[in-house]
Structures are given as C-alpha cells and as structure tokens.
Design a protein with these regions (language model features):
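Glycine-rich FAD pyrophosphate-binding loop
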Residues: 3-23
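Conserved FAD-binding catalytic core of PHBH/FMO-like flavoproteins
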Residues: 93, 98-100, 106-245, 254
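Active-site metal-binding loops of divalent metal-dependent hydrolases
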Residues: 15, 263, 269
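Glycine-rich phosphate/pyrophosphate-binding beta-alpha loops
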Residues: 249-255, 270-282, 314, 331
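Active-site-adjacent segment of FAD-dependent monooxygenases/related oxidoreductases
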Residues: 23, 27-94
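Generic enzyme active-site microenvironment
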Residues: 11-12, 130-133, 266, 273
Length: 375
C-alpha cells in the first residue's frame, strides 16, 4: 500500500528466506475488502475455498451450538478458507512488483525515533516511519508497553488432504464435548503450484498438556477424536507422526497506544488474542489499510499516526473484548459455561436479530473503521 503511494519501503525479515508460518485461516469480508482495494482478491480466490457458514454441534446429542451464515448479512459476502502459503504468495509477489525492498536474516529488536536495531546490534539509517508488524511477541511492541499474557489453551493443527464427503466444502465445521474438547475442519483450497485441495484440521489442547500428548503417541489421541467425531477417521489416517501437528500457543494483549514517535504498530504486535472469532489476519489487514489511508490523507506524520490510532481504537477494543469473553465458552474446564452455550446461547442465536448480528460479528463488521462500509 505505501509503496503504491510512491514511498520507499524496506521490509526487514527475521528469517533467511521469507516464508509463511501458521495454520490455514478464514479471510473475512473485512479482510477481503482490503484485498479488493489492492486488486488482489481474484488471485487469492483462485487458490481459496469460499465459506458460506460456520457450523458447530455438541457431540453427545448432536445439538446445534453454532450456526452462522454469511447470507444473513445485509450485504452478503462469503468468507474464504485460505492456506497461509496462498495469501503469502499473492502479497509477496505484489510487494516485489511495487518495488518493496526485502532484507532477510535481520531480526529487529528495538526502534527509536525512526531508527531500528537488530539482534546483532547493528542499526539502520533513520526512516521517516517504522511499522512494527513482527507479531504477538514483538520486542519492539514490548518496549512500548505491550504485555503479552499467555492463555492456558491452544490448539494442535495440521494441513491434510481435503477428506471430501460427508464434510461440507463450504463450511467451517466444529464438534464439541463441553468446552474441554473441540475438533474442527476448515477447507482451505490449495497451495500455489499444487492443485490438490486441502483442509486445516485442529484439536483444542491445553499448552501444558502438549508434552504428555506427544509422549502418549497418536493412537490414544486418535481414539478420542474418533469418539467425538467418527467421520474424521479418514482424515486421521493421513496423520502418522506427531510432528505433522503443530501446537499453536495463544495469548492476549492490547497495546494501549499503537503509535509513538515515528512508530506505528499493527497486527498481532498491537493486539493479539485467541482466534475463536477468526479475526487475526483480517485485523492486521485492516490496520495496514487504515494506516496507509491516514498517511495518504495527512502529510503531517504525528497527525496521521493519531488518526490511525483513533480510527482503529474501538474496533480493536470491541473484538478483543468479544474474543476474551467468548473463548471460555469453547476452551475451558468446567461445565457451567458449555451448558449455557449449549442450552441458552444456541437457542438465542436463532432468534432475530441474532443471526444477522452473529454474521456481522464473525465478518469483522461491528464498528468497522472503514467509512465506505455500510452493512
């Protein structure tokens, strides 16, 4: 975005080769709108899988707990299930075409008045603006007040071949037993250069239990998954080594102010939380768009940074609060919250105007900071 405005942009990448890291995810209508602005939606859609609803049921009785349909939006638009490599490839290529300079094998650990310092102690020239997009454990954000709080629960995830029927290729599907067990399957399209369709499989797990899970071997765990959701048997057959499953560790923090002198913080570096509402990548894209728009509108840097912080404040705070509030209904010990979820919230969610409100919530549209959006 900034390079297309005619600015010289340098990206410092901590690894020797820039590459995607992480599970498949959902691009929500807010994130897709940013890609629309960049003219990149079509390239992502060619690799992605349209998702028109999110469905969750309780395992014992099959009670529907979650049923969110994007058709309930005033302006319906499906989400996309995306393999992380697909979005990376499209954005990386666009950056190179726009003239962005990428310096690899440079981990930046500090920023002061437009100058960056790397892990080896080397300093960069002074930049007009530093944008910290280095993730939830950013050392730059930590120096400006970010206090990352690890959450007790995370998830095991793996990329698998798409299993086909009876799984719905247009839905994120989840099955729960209480709030302590959850298994999900998300269709994520394909990787660049590989036509085979894929899924992201995930299993809720306390991070403290990860070592015990590995030590026990896959078969006892597979038996648990099959007992919860028998249809996953074929999918589980593709998992033969614990190393195929990666533990995602979740944490929560919200930076009090995402700006400082010649510094803007975006994405998980500014605000991270559980992915229960599926907003992480989309929030980062929104941050980038709002920041670029503020810089284009106002040549005065402090004023532009203040506008960025102001326009993102309430949207970020709302979704951070919603995520923190909803997560214990899906990832927690105890029986009270899942009982409320199964017997009360599930029924209330079917009463108007709840279906539209839920669709707007998971789409990221509540308090959307973009002035051109009308729901």
């Amino acid at each position: 975005m900034l390079a297309r405005q005619g600015r010289r942009v340098v990206v410092f990448e901590r690894f020797r080769q820039a590459a995607p890291v992480g599970a498949g995810f959902m691009l929500q209508p807010t994130g897709l709108a940013v890609l629309d602005d960049l003219g990149l939606t079509g390239a992502v859609e060619a690799l992605a899988q349209p998702i028109d609803h999110i469905f969750g049921r309780e395992a014992r009785r099959g009670r529907v707990v979650l049923d969110v349909r994007y058709a309930d939006l005033k302006r319906p638009r499906a989400a996309l299930g995306v393999h992380r490599a697909a979005l990376f490839e499209v954005l990386h290529r666009a950056c190179l075409e726009a003239g962005v300079v990428i310096e690899t094998d440079r981990e930046m650990v500090a920023a002061s008045a437009g100058r960056l310092s790397d892990a080896c102690g080397a300093a960069t020239p002074v930049f007009d603006l530093v944008v910290d997009a280095s993730g939830a454990r950013s050392r730059i954000a930590a120096a400006h007040g970010a206090r990352f709080r690890p959450l007790a629960w995370g998830a095991l995830w793996a990329t698998t071949p798409w299993p086909g029927a009876p799984f719905d290729e247009a839905a994120l599907q989840q099955v729960y037993r209480g709030a302590a067990k959850m298994v999900g399957v998300l269709p994520v399209g394909s990787r660049p250069g590989a036509p085979d369709r894929l899924a992201t499989f995930f299993w809720s797990l306390k991070t403290a239990d990860h070592v015990a899970w590995r030590d026990a071997g896959l078969e006892p765990w597979k038996a648990q998954v099959r007992a919860l959701w028998p249809e996953t048997t074929g999918l589980l057959d593709s998992l033969t080594d614990p190393d195929q499953l990666t533990l995602a560790r979740y944490g929560h923090h919200t930076l009090a102010s995402p700006v400082a002198e010649r510094l803007a913080v975006i994405g998980d570096a500014a605000h991270s939380t559980s992915p229960q509402l599926g907003q992480g990548v989309n929030m980062g894209l929104l941050d980038a768009r709002v920041l670029a728009d503020a810089l284009e509108r106002d040549e005065d840097l402090p004023a532009a940074l203040a506008a960025y912080a102001r326009r993102r404040r309430w949207h970020v705070r709302l979704y951070q609060a919603l995520s923190l509030g909803f997560t214990p209904f899906y990832q927690a010990d105890g029986r009270v919250r899942p009982w409320i979820r199964d017997h009360l919230l599930g029924k209330l969610a079917r009463l108007p105007p709840s279906p539209r409100l839920l669709a707007a919530t998971v789409s990221g549209l509540l308090l959307d900071p973009r002035p051109d959006v009308r729901r």
